[in-house]
């Protein structure tokens, strides 16, 4: 049972096929008989899925080992290669007595030189690969020899020096002997029939060929047969519930799809470039498998795989070949692969054996990254006068293709203009003007990863330019999207700068054990909405001096918030103690500032929260504030930017170009425009002054909208939020104007960072934070944890709902496991809910009213009635007329249906990603398949309103309209607590509910769904079908328990309020009341909320009690909820006789 819900690895991944190769022995290899060798066998499908046998001595080839390799989930080739090498003695030079000596030269990049080779010549190649960290140095030298051994075989020795070696200069060299190449598509076919497969192959002999020496032959012959190897195979699936047959079918379809796409791309290339078709690949060299190949035209189903017909097809060229200079017919084209995750290029022929044992193990354990589909080749723009002579071009060959020099000379010269791209139209669509290509559009979704661009077998080297050009364009686009932007729709009103100076006259605290006074170690926690700052602490002082600063943005919906300041005493081992607190309204601070960019000093008296409550002198916080508006910052941006980053008085064209290039995307022509603006000749040595540069940038069209600015002019960095900012999910300072203001201010002042979720969490000790994370989950805005954070919409106060520790832990264990889906658990919840409802309908339950009011500190001044006969009558109590009036008379405003904690999502997909984690959650299931053409996951927005037991439990109409026929849906009684909603259980789709259609003239038809929950007796409606209701009119009520109301509305003509959407995207519930605006049609603007100034501590405490319970009441009841005591009494009575 998991306490903390983590990410399930591999849940959505395809099953992996495990191929077991039983390598028994090699036979009839002449080199092993002639020389004293140390044979080793490598088995590989590509660089990352490779294994090798142990190294044997004295030419012994009886390995008798079983190697396990994973088949790639996204295969690009059907071939399995079994390569036999001779492991040369450690430290020995990579040469043999009968071979000419070779020389190696270490260079910083791979160098390849080839020598001529006739059909009777023998080539010796020496590869020296030195790896250190992430740097790889490779040199390959070929030396030809006129000697003609019989039968001759090409040798390839490779030297490696790796960090895992025992000695610093230890060399591991391998001499190539031969290999077998086996098709995985043919390997498991039964020989007696073509309609069935066998995934366990008994040991058979397979021929080993010298592939390097045999490349100049039209077909294999005995001259290049070097021996045999005895192999057995077995294919398995790593997922037990998935049959091997099904997994192999999926793997084969994936491969056929990939190869079919390659075939089509190369066919287009041949037709567009007028080049002759490529040379045919050599067939499989296995003597134990059929030479017939599979035609790759369509995916295979499970039945097709069992009853397939044998057909012939061509063996296509590998899509990932690189281009190598071919000056002779005996040269080897090296296949290269690109590791997206590690940005490391490996040679699949040689570097499979260039890695030491530790590196091979690591590579083999890698999970394969999901490669995107291979794109078609995109050709870069080519000059008209460019001509290409194919006789001097580099040809790209398959591993076994040979092009004779005379064949190359016969190829015609082709103009680059004759080479057309299959994606010209796509490339033109991507090339947009600066005005149309708005890379700062917030509505577009940013891609998280770079797409892999693989070379797909082009015959011309310059065709790769299109790939690099497209990749570079994508890089520029993503870089711009991930950097600063200027939002025209919504930006901060300005930036507030706060100076925390000092505190005077703090009281000496009294030690509870020694009864002596001591000086504290104070620090300050300052919160403004969801931003929480914490100063450093001062040791043993009652008059601490901090001299620290805080700077942050203020948005329009935060103008009614206040600064909450708390002084805390730091303790080394025990919990930190709150000492004093105070409040300062932001609106009051703004009214006292007379001039822009002016510091306003404050002496704020502090209210003590420790004994004695009245010190000899009242503590005072000395601080100052400054507010700078956004228009002022934008107007002075370029002057401050140039003064900060440019020290020269005059700048020439080169200096201007360098400066603009550091800021973002500017061309040489852009720099010329600045000089032309002042009638300056750029290349005549003339220059412009700093003031002219500022003036030009302020009036220049390309700089006034800030689209091309990618880095901060002061720090020259792009927008990369800190780890603490990502953890707390704060409003990221991604606006260039406000970031530059804060960045410039931080250069000269010690500035604090908003790194905490709440002021209570900022004052906790480190071990408390560790314990909370281990038991409840990561304490952060937006994380899936057991901490329920609610923000009051009027004041901006963020408070955590108080739930006892064992209740949190119990709910986390139950709803993250399989218990909720069990029949016994569902039956228990239903029985308890019905029993509790009957109990609270009895007159004896009236005695529970007073403890409930006391525990939740409820204010009953707005209640219409005072006397209640049963607890349920009190629970669904009515309020006095006029207590919950709509905020506006505009009929195109949608209002809150209940006093609740609200989360809203513009799309259903967002709600699934952020809040509702049920596996089977869908609008179709929630609405009981009501009008699925209109109400589905693609067309609707959703609002979720959760009612806690202490809330007013009558629900009201959110708009004007006509009530449709209510549909009652029976279901379960799961809790609607966010911990359960964020589990994999579909709470909303399984619980009891009523579907109420409302036909509104302004919003169209919407669904109003009251949902019952644990301990809810029933859902009662006070409206009937065809009733015409107005905004705020009562529709019904819940009996005892927590509950939820969901509103589903088509989003084609509707938008939720921006502050609710912002909070919901960070998993923060917003406290709303009946009549508050929650959204509007697209015809009207969002309702501007009236600022509510709350200075009275009693009112602030009342808001906190509405969200949670008071500290005193929580402690008096053992820090457990009132429902817990009720359930405990019921359980004690039921099981008293046991």
From Swiss-Prot:
PTM description: Is synthesized initially as an inactive proenzyme. Formation of the active enzyme involves a self-maturation process in which the active site pyruvoyl group is generated from an internal serine residue via an autocatalytic post-translational modification. Two non-identical subunits are generated from the proenzyme in this reaction, and the pyruvate is formed at the N-terminus of the alpha chain, which is derived from the carboxyl end of the proenzyme.
GO term, biological process aspect, one: intermembrane phospholipid transfer
Keyword tRNA-binding applies: no
Disruption phenotype annotation: Decreases induction of mitophagy in stationary phase following growth on a respiratory carbon source.
Enzyme active site: 899 (charge relay system), 956 (charge relay system), 1043 (charge relay system), 1043 (schiff-base intermediate with substrate)
NCBIfam families linked to this entry: PS_decarb
Skewed-composition ranges (Acidic residues): 421-448
Official protein name in the record: Phosphatidylserine decarboxylase proenzyme 2
GO cellular component, one term: Golgi membrane
Positions with a binding annotation for Ca(2+): 571, 574, 577
Recorded family membership: Belongs to the phosphatidylserine decarboxylase family. PSD-B subfamily. Eukaryotic type II sub-subfamily.
Keyword Lipid metabolism listed: yes
UniProt remark on domains: The C2 domains have an essential, but non-catalytic function. Both C2-1 and C2-2 facilitate interaction with PstB2/PDR17 and are required for lipid transport function.
Gene3D superfamilies per UniProt: C2 domain
Enzyme Commission number(s) from the entry: 4.1.1.65
Localization (cell): Golgi apparatus membrane; Endosome membrane
Stretches with biased composition (Polar residues): 125-135
GO molecular function per UniProt: metal ion binding; phosphatidylserine decarboxylase activity
Cofactor: pyruvate; Ca(2+)
Cofactor: how and how many bound: Binds 1 pyruvoyl group covalently per subunit.
Annotated region (Disordered), positions in chain: 90-166, 269-305, 413-448
Membrane topology value: Peripheral membrane protein
């Amino acid at each position: 049972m998991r306490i903390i819900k983590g990410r399930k690895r591999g849940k959505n991944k395809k099953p992996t096929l495990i191929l077991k190769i039983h390598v028994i022995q090699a036979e009839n290899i002449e080199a092993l008989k002639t020389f004293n060798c140390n044979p080793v066998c490598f088995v590989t499908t590509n660089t990352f899925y490779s294994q090798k046998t142990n190294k044997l001595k004295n030419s012994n080839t009886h390995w008798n080992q079983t190697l396990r390799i994973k088949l790639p989930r996204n295969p690009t080739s059907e071939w399995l290669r079994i390569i036999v090498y001779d492991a040369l003695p450690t430290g020995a030079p990579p040469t043999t007595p009968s071979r000419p000596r070779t020389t190696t030269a270490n260079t910083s990049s791979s160098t390849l030189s080839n020598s001529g080779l006739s059909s009777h010549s023998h080539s010796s190649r020496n590869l020296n690969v030195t790896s250190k960290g992430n740097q790889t140095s490779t040199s390959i030298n070929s030396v030809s020899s006129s000697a003609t051994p019989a039968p001759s075989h090409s040798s390839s020795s490779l030297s490696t020096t790796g960090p895992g070696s025992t000695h610093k200069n230890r060399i591991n060299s391998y001499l190539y002997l031969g290999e077998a190449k086996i098709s995985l598509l043919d390997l498991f076919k039964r020989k007696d029939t073509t309609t069935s497969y066998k995934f366990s192959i008994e040991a058979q002999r397979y021929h080993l060929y010298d592939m390097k020496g045999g490349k100049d032959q039209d077909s294999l012959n005995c001259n290049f047969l070097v021996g045999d190897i005895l192999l057995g195979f077995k294919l398995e699936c790593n997922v037990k519930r998935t049959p091997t047959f099904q997994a192999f079918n999926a793997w084969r379809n994936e491969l056929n799809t990939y190869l079919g796409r390659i075939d089509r791309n190369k066919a287009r290339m041949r037709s567009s470039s007028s080049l002759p078709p490529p040379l045919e690949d050599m067939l499989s060299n296995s003597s134990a498998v059929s030479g017939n190949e599979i035609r790759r035209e369509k995916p295979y189903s499970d039945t097709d795989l069992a009853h397939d017909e044998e057909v012939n097809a061509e063996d296509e060229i590998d899509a990932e070949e690189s281009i190598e200079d071919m000056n002779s017919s005996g040269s080897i084209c090296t296949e290269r692969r690109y590791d997206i995750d590690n940005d490391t290029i490996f040679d699949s022929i040689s570097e499979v054996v260039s890695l030491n044992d530790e590196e091979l193990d690591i590579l083999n354990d890698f999970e394969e990254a999901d490669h995107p589909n291979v794109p078609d080749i995109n050709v870069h723009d080519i000059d008209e006068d460019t001509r290409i002579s194919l006789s001097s071009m580099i040809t790209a060959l398959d591993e076994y293709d040979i092009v004779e020099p005379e064949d190359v000379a016969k190829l015609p010269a082709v103009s680059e203009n004759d080479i057309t791209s299959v994606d010209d139209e796509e490339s033109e669509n991507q090339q947009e003007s600066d005005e149309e290509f708005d890379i700062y559009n917030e509505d577009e979704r940013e891609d998280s990863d770079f797409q892999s661009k693989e070379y797909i077998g082009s015959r011309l080297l310059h065709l790769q330019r299109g790939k690099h050009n497209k990749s570079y364009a994508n890089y520029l686009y993503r870089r711009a999207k991930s950097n600063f932007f200027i939002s025209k729709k919504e930006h901060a009103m300005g930036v507030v700068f706060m100076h925390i100076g000092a505190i005077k006259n703090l009281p000496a605290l009294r030690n509870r054990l020694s009864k002596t006074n001591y000086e504290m170690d104070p620090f300050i926690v300052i919160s403004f909405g969801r931003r929480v700052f914490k100063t450093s602490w001062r040791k043993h002082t009652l008059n601490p001096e901090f001299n620290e600063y805080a700077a942050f943005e203020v948005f329009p919906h935060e103008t009614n918030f206040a600064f909450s300041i708390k002084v805390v005493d730091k303790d080394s081992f025990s919990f930190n103690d709150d000492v004093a607190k105070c409040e300062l309204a932001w609106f009051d601070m703004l009214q006292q500032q007379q001039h822009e960019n002016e510091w306003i000093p404050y002496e704020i008296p502090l209210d003590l929260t420790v004994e004695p409550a009245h010190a000899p002198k009242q503590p005072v916080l000395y601080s100052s504030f400054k507010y700078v508006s956004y228009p002022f910052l934008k107007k002075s941006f370029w002057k401050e930017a140039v003064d900060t980053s440019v020290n020269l008085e005059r700048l020439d064209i080169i200096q201007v170009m360098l400066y603009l290039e550091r800021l973002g995307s500017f061309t040489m022509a852009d720099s010329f425009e600045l000089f032309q603006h002042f009638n300056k000749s750029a290349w005549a040595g003339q220059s412009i002054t700093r003031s002219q540069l500022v003036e030009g940038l302020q009036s220049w069209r390309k700089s006034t909208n800030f689209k091309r600015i990618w880095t901060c002019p002061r720090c020259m960095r792009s927008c990369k939020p800190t780890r603490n900012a990502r953890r707390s999910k704060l409003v990221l300072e991604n606006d260039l104007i406000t970031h530059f203001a804060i960045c410039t201010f931080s250069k000269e002042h010690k500035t604090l960072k908003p790194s905490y979720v709440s002021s209570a969490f900022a004052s906790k000790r480190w071990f408390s934070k560790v314990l909370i994370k281990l038991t409840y989950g990561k304490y952060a805005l937006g994380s899936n944890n057991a901490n329920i954070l609610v923000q009051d919409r009027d004041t901006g106060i963020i408070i955590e709902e108080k739930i006892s520790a064992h209740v949190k832990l119990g709910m986390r264990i139950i709803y993250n496991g399989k218990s909720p889906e069990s029949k016994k658990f569902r039956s228990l919840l239903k029985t308890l809910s019905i029993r509790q409802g009957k109990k609270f309908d009895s007159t004896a339950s009236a005695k529970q009213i007073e403890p409930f009011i006391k525990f939740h500190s409820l204010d009953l001044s707005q209640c219409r009635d005072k006397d209640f006969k049963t607890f349920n009558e009190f629970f669904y109590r009515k309020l006095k007329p006029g207590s919950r009036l709509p905020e506006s008379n505009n009929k195109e405003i949608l209002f809150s249906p209940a006093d609740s904690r609200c989360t809203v999502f513009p799309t259903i997909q967002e709600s699934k990603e952020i809040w509702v984690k049920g596996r089977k959650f869908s609008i179709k299931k929630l609405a009981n398949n009501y009008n699925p053409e209109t109400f589905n996951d693609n067309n609707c927005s959703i609002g979720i309103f959760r009612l806690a037991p202490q809330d007013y439990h009558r629900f009201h109409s959110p708009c004007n309209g006509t009530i449709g026929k209510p549909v009652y849906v029976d279901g379960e009684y799961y809790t609607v607590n966010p911990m359960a909603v964020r589990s994999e259980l579909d709470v909303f789709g399984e619980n009891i509910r009523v579907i109420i259609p409302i036909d509104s003239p302004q919003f169209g038809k919407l669904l109003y769904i009251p949902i019952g929950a644990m301990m809810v007796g029933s859902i009662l409606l006070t409206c009937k079908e065809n009733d015409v209701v107005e905004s705020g009119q009562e529709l019904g009520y819940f009996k005892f328990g927590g509950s939820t109301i969901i509103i589903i509305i088509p989003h084609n003509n509707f938008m939720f309020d921006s502050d609710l959407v912002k909070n919901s995207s960070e998993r923060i519930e917003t406290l709303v009341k009946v009549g508050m605006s929650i959204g509007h049609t697209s015809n009207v603007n969002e309702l501007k909320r009236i600022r509510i100034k709350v200075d009275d501590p009693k009112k602030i405490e009342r808001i906190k009690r509405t969200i949670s319970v008071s500290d005193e009441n929580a402690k008096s009841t053992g820090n457990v909820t009132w429902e817990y005591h009720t359930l405990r009494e019921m359980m004690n009575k039921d099981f008293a006789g046991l």
